[in-house]
């Protein structure tokens, strides 16, 4: 995005490294891009090695002891495979560790490698680690029978360890925080990473987003609220919208100031000009977003960056896939950009 309207804007940040594990074969940037080009859907039934979906499925959404969908978007790899000695831990520690933690460690390593940063170069650096996550299914599995609870459950399943274990293993000295804000967890983690660099608390930041589905409890509770799609598909901004489809993934990006990235000869994969967050306040229901809050956030973020809103031609939306959330978000985007759009200059969402 170009075009600045202020000389007082925040110093731009650069994404210098990335790595991720997404559903099915989308485990690299090239594979993910190819999936997008093909418009390929990777929704499948719940894997048999995770849970017996037949034992939990019932088509009647009014039943509170079941789920009304049969699938979602799942990682294809073996979640039990992990090189524990490489990450300085025993087999007993690894066994008690949430697969999210295991894959986060692996993905951070690859993201730093992607950025051209060897471990010895980042060790003892002022690097923040902010992890966003929304689930702790492995904790539920580990604590179902207290008599069989592994010794290392406390550190293996605590959500804070998604960030803290990365900081420990790579010897990073910046802020280390795990955050849960439901669907926005990963983006809030990104916002907090940016703020840590802009505030001077960190010279570089690692942003993490993770989700793994291992038990039916969270899926069941979300389905009870009518938030999940019976079709296991998200029909965002579509008349067929009936909820969202749950999915798995681990994503990591490495961020530093743009001027530092240019000075160090880093590959700049994207530039972040501004980042902000807010809350809806008291809406008609606690899960219902606020159009006015979203409009304010969009405008405030552009203003803080000194960016000209008329130059934006593409906007990536949340796209809840719900009959309530989608219209609110569409109206908010429309209100924020209305004066800058025309048939000749549309805004693609």
Predicted region positions:
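Condensing-enzyme catalytic core of the thiolase-fold
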Residues: 2-349
């Amino acid at each position: 995005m170009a075009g600045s309207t202020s000389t007082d804007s925040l110093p731009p940040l650069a994404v210098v490294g990335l790595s991720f594990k997404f559903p099915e074969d989308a485990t690299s940037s090239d594979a993910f891009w190819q999936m997008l080009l093909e418009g390929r859907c990777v929704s499948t039934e719940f894997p048999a090695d995770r849970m017996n979906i037949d034992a939990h499925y019932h088509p009647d959404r009014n039943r509170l002891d079941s789920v009304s969908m049969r699938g979602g978007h799942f990682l294809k790899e073996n979640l039990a495979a992990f090189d524990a000695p490489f990450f300085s831990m025993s087999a007993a520690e690894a066994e008690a560790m949430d697969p999210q933690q295991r894959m986060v460690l692996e993905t951070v390593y690859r993201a730093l490698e992607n950025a051209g940063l060897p471990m010895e170069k980042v060790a003892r650096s002022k690097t923040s680690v902010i992890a966003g996550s929304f689930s702790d299914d492995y904790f539920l599995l580990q604590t179902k029978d207290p008599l069989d609870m592994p010794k290392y459950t406390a550190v293996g399943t605590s959500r804070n360890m998604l960030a803290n274990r990365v900081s420990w293993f790579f010897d990073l000295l910046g802020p280390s925080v795990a955050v849960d804000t439901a669907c926005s967890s990963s983006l809030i983690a990104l916002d907090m990473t940016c703020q840590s660099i802009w505030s001077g608390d960190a010279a570089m930041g690692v942003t993490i987003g993770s989700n793994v589905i291992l038990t039916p409890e969270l899926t069941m509770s979300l389905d009870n609220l009518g938030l999940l799609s019976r079709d296991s598909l998200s029909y965002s901004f579509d008349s067929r919208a009936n909820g969202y489809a749950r999915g798995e993934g681990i994503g990591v990006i490495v961020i530093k100031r743009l001027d530092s990235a240019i000075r160090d000869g880093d590959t700049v994969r994207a530039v972040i000009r501004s980042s902000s967050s807010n809350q809806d306040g008291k809406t008609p229901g606690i899960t219902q977003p606020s159009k006015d809050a979203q409009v304010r956030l969009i405008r405030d973020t552009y203003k803080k960056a000194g960016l000209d809103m008329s130059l934006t031609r593409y906007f990536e939306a949340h796209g809840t896939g719900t009959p309530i959330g989608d219209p609110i978000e569409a109206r908010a985007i429309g209100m924020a950009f209305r004066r800058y759009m025309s048939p000749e200059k549309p805004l693609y969402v």
